[in-house]
Amino acid sequence: DRVYVHPFSL
């Protein structure tokens, strides 16, 4: 699981 997910996809 991701600890932090970016609000936007790179």
Swiss-Prot record:
Q: Name one GO biological process term.
A: vasoconstriction
Location in or out of the cell:
Secreted
Q: Give the keywords, sorted.
A: Secreted, Vasoactive, Vasoconstrictor
One GO cellular component assignment for this chain's record is: extracellular region
Question: What does the sequence similarity comment in the record state about its family?
Answer: Belongs to the serpin family.
Question: What is the annotated role of this protein in its UniProt record?
Answer: In response to lowered blood pressure, the enzyme renin cleaves angiotensin-1, from angiotensinogen. ACE (angiotensin converting enzyme) then removes a dipeptide to yield the physiologically active peptide angiotensin-2, the most potent pressor substance known, which helps regulate volume and mineral balance of body fluids.
Name the record gives this protein? Angiotensinogen
User: Where does this protein come from, organism-wise?
Assistant: Gallus gallus
